[in-house]
Amino acid sequence: MVFVETRIFTKKCSLYLPDDEFRELQNFLINKPNAGTLIQGTGGLRKLRWSLDNKGKRGGIRVIYYWQLSKNQIYLMTLYSKNEKT
């Protein structure tokens, strides 16, 4: 599986996810690339709720990504905390 990051994702990732947690997220997506909820009307974008240490899923972050099965790639579009967007 190949991960492709947008600039905004890379910037926000450094704010929210330490390297070890980011690797956990990548490993999770490798094993379950369709885990996120499909966002209607986007052509296949998915939203994944990801828990941060001691915060659980509700207090964690949301990861927006696109899984392109034909190329075996996951495009990491953006991420945000629940407080940042609803």
Regions found by a protein language model. Give the residues of each.
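Enriched for short, Lys/Arg-rich terminal
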Residues: 67-86
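Basic, Lys/Arg-enriched alpha-helical interface segments
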Residues: 1-55, 71
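Residue-level signature of transmembrane alpha-helix interfaces in integral membrane proteins
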Residues: 18-21, 65, 76
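Short, surface-exposed coil-to-beta transition loops
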Residues: 59-63
